[in-house]
Each structure stands twice: as C-alpha cells, then as structure tokens.
C-alpha cells in the first residue's frame, strides 16, 4: 500500500486547519464546493451538509483558484485543510491539545441576511476559544442588477458594477461590519485592513459564481503564512495526535472514527489511545482510510487504504472496540511510549473538558466533548445547575436520571445536536420530564429559562388563587342596599385586592375586629371574583348588621391570616401591585404594634 502525506514535501510544517462555519443556508457547503471543484452539494438533501468532513486543498490548487493573487513560491505551508461543520448544526468547539482544533476559521454570512442565531453563537465561541477568523460575506451576486464575472477577484468585479449596484452592496457590507462591531470585533473590507491581528477581514464572495473566492484563499494562506507559521511546526515523524470528528459504522470495517490529525504520524498497526466513556480505549489500528486530496471525507463512497498519514490530514481509522469512542475526544498514537502514560495523557485532556456537576440540577447531552463544554459553560454563566453532562444521544437512562431530582424545574433534559431515542421520548412523556433539543446552545439556555419562568409563574398563580390577599375598602354613603343576612353595601376599594369568601373587619386600636365574610361581589350587576384598587362595587357580607356592626363611611380591612401574611411579605411582595404592597405594609404595621413578631 502507498504512503499518504498531505504534501509532496511537508518538511516540519503542517497544513493549517480551517473551520468553515455559519448559519444554516448561508452557503458554507456551496463555498467549499466552489473551492474544491466537486459537486458535493448536488447529492445532498436540502442542500445542507449531513455529516462532518474534511477536505485537503494543496498549495498548487490554492494557486490555481487564486490565480495571480497567489505566488506559490512565496509560501512554505503545504496548503489548507478545511473542516466542514454540518450545515444544520452550529459550530461546536472541536479541540486539539491546548486549544481549538481549527487554526483559523471562515465565518460565512449571507450579506443580505446578516447575523442570525447560529452566526451569533459561532462568534461567541470563536471569541471564547481565541480562534482567528475572516468573514466571507456571501451571495454578493444576489445584489439586484449584479453583473457576474465568474471566478474573478472581488475588487475587479466590484469595479465593473454600476454605481447603484455598488452602493447597494456597500450598504449591506457596512451593515455587516456594524454587526461585527456590536459583537465586539473591529472589521473592514480585507483590502483596507492594515493589521489582521487587530481587525477582522471581510471578504465579499459569491459561492455561486466564484467571485471573491481567489481573495478568500489568498487571505487565508497569507494569514497562516504570516502569523501562524511557527504554530504549524510539528514533529512530522513523532507519534500522531488528533481529534475525533465523528464515530460511525462503516460497512466492512465496523465502528470507525473520522479523525483530524494535527500532529505527527499515524501508521497502520499502531497502538492508539482514544478518548471514551467510561475510560479511554486502547486498540490497534487495523486500517487507515483516506480519500484523495480534493475529495470530501463525507461523500466518498470508498476509501483507499494507506500505510501511514502525516499531519495535518483528515482520515478514517478502523480498529476494534471503538463503539464507546466520543466525538471531540483526543486520539493518540502510543509509539515507543508506555501505554499507561498515554492513557494518563488522554485522561488529563478529557479532564480539561470535564464539566462540574452537582447532586441537584438538569441532565445535559451533547454531540461532542467541545460542545458539551460550551453548553455547560453557558449554563454556569446563567447559574443553571447541572447534575449530569455526557456526550451522546438522549437515552432512557438519561430520562431515568432526570426523574431523581427534587425540584420540578430540574426535571429537564437539554440536548445539543443529538437525537432523542424513541424509547427515551416515550419515557420522558410518561414521567413528565421536559426535553429541549436544539442546535443553538444559547437557544437551549433561553428555552430552559423560559420554561422555569413559566413554571414559577404558574406556581405563583396557584398560590395567589389560594391565598388571602390584603385589601382596604370603604363603605360608600347612601349605598346600603340591605342591612343584614347578608348585608349588601356599595364600597370603594382603596388599596389591594378584595376577593370573594374573604374575612373582613374594622381596626380597633392595634387589633382587627372581625365583622364577617365577603360572600359575593358585583360590578354593575355582574358577579365578579375580585375587585381591585379604585373599583366601586357592591358586596354582600355575611355576619354584620349595617347601622350596628358596620356603618356608612367605615373603613374595613381584609382579615389576613398570619401564615398568609408571612408568605406575602417574605415570598410574594415583589409580585404584588404597588397599592397591594401598601395595604400589606399598613396591615403588618398595625398587627406588629401589638406583636412585633407577627407574620415573621
């Protein structure tokens, strides 16, 4: 079998790893498709990438596409290796030893749509991981009146457009630059950027016509060559180090792992350690599979066997016992080291992304270690406790775990980029466990917070329905409709909420002298459950006789049970209207003159 290197003469410089990310339908796959010249997208449902993959684009191909913009003799780096994150997923933090897997990223933004939820999430994660990036402002060809110039550098094709078209595109581009500023990044059109370490370059492109693609490749190669060359220095012949992109069954090979190799060499027959749950897997490489340089790992139906692979490269590793391998986990070649030492190294790297969990909280599942870390970090920021956090689909045991919590608001499962197994969905419905599943981390956080808010609101409403509310009301002059059995009088509610079936009385000194119970309330002849401050209503009061126990002009209070007063004062004050808070405070002041600890 042949050897497979990513370049003819890589020396000690590896290929820079480029992540392509952006909101669904903004053209990530189309852009990569244009770069590699294959028709990947035409074979995919809904024009959305279905699986993660990687594409190696050698320097000579970059030079071909970029034309006069790139002089290959000026570059030492062997080319570019693109990771294609799935179109229906947001960018997750694929990690390498000590940081983000990608050396540089392309953030693809539809110039007409601007920032969308997944764009904003990608920006947050790029900022958190410190990954340098450029913005590909895609779909410039959809500007009304655009005159396409296929595969041309963007400045030339821009100059060829009419004044109106240029003006419309300028407006869209500067709106995008404004959104970048709002996100905390200084950016400008790439040819105006003097220092790419301080400013993000915006490159207008069309994945459809290829316009601007030469500029994009030129900028990527230039940035990598100028700012990252030292980071590309690797020990080519050293033991391989990589990150698992995806774990999947492959006909004829069993469970395999798709890997981005970012350091060293991996050979067929090597002993490797792969991050897994509950502990790392130690296994021997049975086969190394690699498509050609310009092929896409996701779409090649057949792979060629190779003896070895050198960084940086995308490859498929076939080996026994890979069933429990985790996407996003490290893979290490043992080489001449002690296996136990490498297992310890992998465990240490897994520990770096291990998440803090407690005895009480929600259950979290995510597709990769990196995205699990990002999700739990977002939950911690929102002060949402996590009881369990693992990589993998939502399974029945996850639902069972969610049922063990004490609080209803923690009886919840959050899934990021994962499937909910049918049995798990059935169990969740039966056990009243809420499951939220999304491909946007911050959407999950917002969904959960909205769920908790709604639950707390329902609980408070239930409490309010069953609690005696404070109120003060005055019997109106000339509004006695019946003297007793029951007394029916017109009243004005001064403050608070007067409800049916509420005991009421007058204040005598520092005590309340109960007069009776409000049995009914009518507003303009219609029965109502309550009356608020400012309302004038007629009430029927069971117990007193007008003229003897109560009189016109008297001010009556709701007789608050002490337990109810305590709940209102200590737990619900902020939910009461201002006038009702005033009524409660006045009532407590009166009661505490007699007993300072009343309602405490």
Curated annotation (Swiss-Prot):
Q: Enumerate the InterPro entries for this protein.
A: EFTu-like_2 (IPR004161), EFTU-type (IPR029459), P-loop_NTPase (IPR027417), Small_GTP-bd (IPR005225), T_Tr_GTP-bd_dom (IPR000795), TF_aIF-2_arc (IPR004544), TIF_IF2 (IPR015760), TIF_IF2_dom3 (IPR023115)
Q: Which BP terms does GO give this entry?
A: translational initiation
Q: Where is this region: G5?
A: 206-208
Q: Name one GO cellular component term.
A: cytoplasm
Question: Which parts of this chain are annotated as the region G2?
Answer: 47-51
- Can you tell me which residues bind GTP? 22-29, 84-88, 138-141
Region (G3): which ranges? 84-87
Residues of the region (G4) are 138-141
Report the superkingdom from the record: Archaea
SUPFAM superfamilies found in the cross-reference section: Initiation factor IF2/eIF5b, domain 3, P-loop containing nucleoside triphosphate hydrolases, Translation proteins
Where is the segment annotated Disordered?
A: 140-162
Q: Does the keyword Transcription regulation apply?
A: no
Question: Which Pfam families does the UniProt entry name for this protein?
Answer: GTP_EFTU, GTP_EFTU_D2, GTP_EFTU_D4, IF-2
Region annotation G1: where it falls in the sequence: 22-29
The tr-type G domain sits at: 13-228
Q: What keyword terms does UniProt attach to this protein?
A: GTP-binding, Initiation factor, Nucleotide-binding, Protein biosynthesis
One GO molecular function term?
GTP binding
Family statement: Belongs to the TRAFAC class translation factor GTPase superfamily. Classic translation factor GTPase family. IF-2 subfamily.
Q: What does this protein do?
A: Function in general translation initiation by promoting the binding of the formylmethionine-tRNA to ribosomes. Seems to function along with eIF-2.
PANTHER family reported for this sequence:
EUKARYOTIC TRANSLATION INITIATION FACTOR 5B, TRANSLATION INITIATION FACTOR IF-2-RELATED
* Name assigned to this protein: Probable translation initiation factor IF-2
**What gene name does this entry carry?**
infB
